[in-house]
């Protein structure tokens, strides 16, 4: 190696270590607040007894595990989770899965339930949730505050977004993705200039603005924000004092910030510049699709990336078991995810996600379905295009997903024909609490 080549390599190493050190300092100065109090009503029966971020996903995880794993893998170790709606299972999961951080060196996942800290009202919106916890934010004294939703599926290095925020001198940075124009109606939509400064922002517009030169795409907010702390405090106080505000980031805080502050967009892309994987699983159809995508030979969302593990609570189950090898009675799974503790006793599973501790009896066939934990499926069942909720018992000979009219009489059928089955729909009351008729 020549002297000039050696100097270039040394310069690259110096630049890498310098940038890494700066990024580490920035992440240490950042407080992450995860909004996890949403009801998730579009998920119907899946959120009857649990908050949306606590809904199981991908065979063994909860939805919130993806945002929290991104934090840990990005070097962010000061995290608050704001809870409200039916939060018991979520809080229990956080206590079991996320108690491994070291409080003595300033690492934590702190649960921040709605407590009426500033009056008689619960969290009235996403912005109000932060406003009611401003004293806690003050105590941690961060330079930057990152706000995340706890209900999306993706893997992302947040430190890169933080560094863009710091280097640009922005007051506010918003993570964004490109989405088809028709789908953009469900998101906050923004316009940017050539320097990625946001010039317009509209929450859930009827007529979404498109990307210049790309009339079929819009630039949509991911619900990920980085704030310089002093700006955030000012914005939250002003919003709390506004009697006409709905106290929501997308409807109130962000549109006002565009006109009064330096707000920039951070495009979430892969290393090659293509659109990175990000899924809003807020409907049963989108939830089912995101799970089905994991069954591909090489899915976009790589759960097997050792450099970016998805952390969760590891329940103690034996390995999955496949038994019987007779014609018509063979325990097998094809293009599927099957978790620990499952027994496929002469049953056939194809293109499905089977969560832990599920048992499927002989001569049954499961296709294109999501089977949540601790489900028992009897003999001679045929199930396709379905989501079966946790703890459901499916009797021998049950057929689901073949007759839309019959399914609609017994269960919930989505616009795209996915059948949701819960224990309550089958008269199996798993909870002592009942709602008076």
Regions found by a protein language model. Give the residues of each.
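Conserved core of the sugar-phosphate nucleotidyltransferase
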Residues: 156-230, 237
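Glycine-rich beta-alpha junction loops
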Residues: 86, 116, 179-181, 205, ...
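Proline-centered turn/helix-capping motifs that create local helix->coil transitions or kinks
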Residues: 98-106, 194-200, 262, 298-303
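Conserved beta-strand termini and adjacent loop/short-helix elements that scaffold enzyme active sites
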Residues: 112-114, 175, 266-268
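Conserved N-terminal catalytic core of the sugar/cofactor nucleotidyltransferase
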Residues: 2-35, 42-51, 56-164, 192, ...
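Left-handed beta-helix
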Residues: 2-31, 230, 234, 238-437
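Short internal beta-strands
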Residues: 81-83, 176, 387
């Amino acid at each position: 190696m020549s002297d000039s080549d050696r100097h270039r390599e040394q310069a690259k190493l110096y630049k890498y270590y310098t940038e890494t050190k700066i990024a580490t300092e920035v992440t240490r100065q950042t407080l992450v607040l995860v909004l996890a109090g949403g009801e998730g009503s579009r998920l119907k029966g899946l959120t009857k007894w649990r908050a949306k971020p606590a809904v199981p996903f991908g065979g063994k995880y909860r939805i919130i595990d993806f945002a929290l794993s991104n934090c840990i893998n990005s070097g962010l170790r000061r995290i608050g989770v704001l809870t409200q709606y039916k939060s018991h299972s979520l809080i229990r999961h956080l206590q079991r899965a996320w108690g491994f951080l070291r409080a003595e060196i300033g690492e934590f996942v702190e649960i921040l339930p709605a407590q009426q800290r500033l009056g008689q009202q619960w969290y009235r919106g996403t912005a109000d949730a932060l406003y009611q916890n401003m004293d806690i934010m003050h105590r941690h004294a961060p330079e930057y505050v990152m706000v995340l939703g706890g209900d999306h599926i993706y893997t992302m290095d947040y430190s890169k977004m933080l560094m863009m925020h710091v280097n640009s001198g922005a007051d506010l940075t918003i993570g964004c993705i490109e989405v088809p124009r028709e789908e953009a109606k469900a998101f906050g939509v923004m316009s940017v200039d050539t320097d990625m400064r946001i010039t317009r922002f509209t929450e859930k517009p009827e007529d979404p603005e498109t990307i210049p030169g790309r009339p079929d795409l819009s630039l949509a907010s991911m619900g990920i924000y980085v704030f310089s702390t002093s700006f955030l405090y000012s914005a939250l106080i002003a919003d709390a004092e506004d009697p006409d505000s709905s106290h929501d980031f997308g409807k109130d805080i962000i549109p006002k910030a565009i006109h009064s502050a330096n707000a920039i967009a951070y495009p979430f892309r892969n290393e090659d510049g293509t659109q990175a994987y990000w899924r809003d699983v807020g409907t049963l159809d989108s939830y089912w699709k995101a799970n089905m995508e994991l069954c591909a030979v090489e899915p976009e969302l790589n759960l097997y990336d050792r450099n970016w593990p998805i952390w969760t609570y590891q329940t103690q189950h034996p390995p999955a078991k496949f038994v019987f090898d007779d014609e018509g009675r063979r325990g097998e799974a094809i293009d599927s995810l099957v978790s620990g503790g499952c027994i496929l006793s002469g049953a056939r599973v194809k293109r499905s996600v089977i969560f832990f501790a599920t048992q499927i009896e002989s001569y049954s066939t499961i296709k294109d379905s999501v089977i949540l934990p601790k489900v028992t499926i009897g003999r001679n069942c045929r199930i396709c295009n379905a989501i079966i909720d946790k703890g459901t018992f499916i009797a021998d000979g049950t057929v689901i997903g073949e007759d839309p009219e019959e399914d609609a009489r017994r269960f919930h059928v989505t616009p795209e024909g996915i059948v949701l089955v819960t224990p309550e729909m089958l008269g199996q009351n798993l909870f002592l609490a009942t709602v008076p008729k």
